[in-house]
């Protein structure tokens, strides 16, 4: 038996899927292969995500492959997965979470704090751009899209002083050496689910249990809390929304940020990790009290 796993065509997506394939072989002794899918988000690199529909752009075609029984499961970056899945699907496993931090990449090793006044920083993320302005309101934000390698090339092609990328992607690609600095995730809040992988299947799929065996309870606890926070705020690519969460013993600590009436609001919450979804909801409600 050989399971078929659908994923995007990018090098990072393939590396992430290969990690899941290794886990399947190691834990379940199951062979698998990739089905590469071109998504709308990959095709439309000339337009900012917030202008063409946001997160679902990276999953719809992959879900279609599942519906058509072309694949048994799909691997996503959790930060790309909308907070509401179509009723036919479920997230059966969240097997691992890499470094959740954002990373600063510059050609000469400069950090954000020692850049020249008016430095040009590449990012198309509203979350990153708005938080950057809190650190340095003199910076010029330049929209860039593309895969990791393409964005790094744009530092020279577009005369940028640096770009911001997810540390997880760089580490998974073996490119940690290009990182000039890391952002403190409790200050510069990551995207919802950043660094985490998710495995999506059709509900009731014959082979779902193989994927479910890869689930990490701690990763699911944190990511579900963050997605609960996002669901209440209806956040996506159109607004600043970020969260940091961590499990310590039986506790879950979480920080969230969101734009309310053109003002960036940040709150935190602490509670029992078993109440993770409720805690995410309560944190969002604390922020909305600022309206």
From Swiss-Prot:
Cross-referenced PROSITE patterns: PORPHOBILINOGEN_DEAM
Q: Which UniProt keywords apply?
A: Porphyrin biosynthesis, Transferase
Instruction: List every position bearing S-(dipyrrolylmethanemethyl)cysteine.
Output: 237
Q: Is Transferase there in the keyword field?
A: yes
State the needed cofactors, names only: dipyrromethane
* Catalysed reaction equations from the record: 4 porphobilinogen + H2O = hydroxymethylbilane + 4 NH4(+)
The UniProt GO MF terms for this protein read:
hydroxymethylbilane synthase activity
Q: Kindly state one GO CC term assigned in the UniProt record.
A: cytoplasm
Would you kindly state one Gene Ontology biological process term found in this protein's UniProt entry?
protoporphyrinogen IX biosynthetic process
What is its pathway? Porphyrin-containing compound metabolism; protoporphyrin-IX biosynthesis; coproporphyrinogen-III from 5-aminolevulinate: step 2/4
Q: How many cofactor units bind, and how? A: Binds 1 dipyrromethane group covalently.
Query: What domain of life does the UniProt record list for this protein's source?
Result: Bacteria
Extra remark beyond the main annotation: The porphobilinogen subunits are added to the dipyrromethane group.
The function of this protein is:
Tetrapolymerization of the monopyrrole PBG into the hydroxymethylbilane pre-uroporphyrinogen in several discrete steps.
- Assembly behavior: Monomer.
As for family, the record states: Belongs to the HMBS family.
- What is the designated name of this protein? Porphobilinogen deaminase
Which gene is annotated as encoding this protein in its UniProt record? hemC
């Amino acid at each position: 038996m050989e399971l078929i796993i659908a994923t995007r065509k990018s090098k990072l997506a393939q590396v992430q899927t290969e990690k899941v394939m290794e886990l399947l072989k190691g834990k379940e002794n199951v062979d698998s292969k990739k089905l590469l899918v071109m998504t709308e988000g990959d095709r439309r690199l000339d337009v900012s995500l917030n202008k063409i529909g946001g997160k679902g752009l990276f999953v719809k075609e992959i879900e279609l492959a599942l519906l058509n029984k072309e694949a048994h499961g799909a691997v996503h970056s959790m930060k790309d997965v909308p907070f509401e899945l179509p009723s036919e699907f479920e997230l059966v496993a969240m097997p691992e979470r890499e470094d959740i931090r954002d990373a600063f990449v510059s050609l000469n090793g400069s950090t954000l704090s020692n850049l020249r006044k008016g430095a040009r920083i590449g990012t198309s993320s509203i979350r990153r751009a708005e938080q950057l302005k809190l650190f340095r309101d003199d910076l010029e934000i330049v929209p860039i899209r593309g895969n990791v390698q393409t964005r790094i090339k744009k530092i020279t092609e577009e005369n940028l002083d640096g770009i911001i990328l997810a540390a997880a992607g760089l580490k998974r690609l073996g490119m940690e050496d290009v990182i000039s600095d890391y952002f403190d995730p409790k200050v510069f809040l990551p995207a919802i689910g950043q660094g985490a992988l998710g495995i999506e299947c059709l509900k009731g799929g014959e082979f779902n249990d193989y994927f479910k065996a890869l689930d990490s309870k701690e990763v699911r606890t944190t990511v579900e809390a963050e997605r609960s926070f996002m669901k209440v705020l209806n956040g996506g690519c159109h607004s600043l929304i970020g969260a940091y969460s961590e499990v310590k013993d039986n506790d879950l600590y979480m920080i969230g940020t969101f734009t309310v009436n053109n003002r960036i609001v940040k709150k935190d919450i602490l509670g029992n990790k078993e109440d993770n979804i409720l805690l995410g909801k309560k944190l969002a409600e604390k922020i909305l009290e600022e309206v």
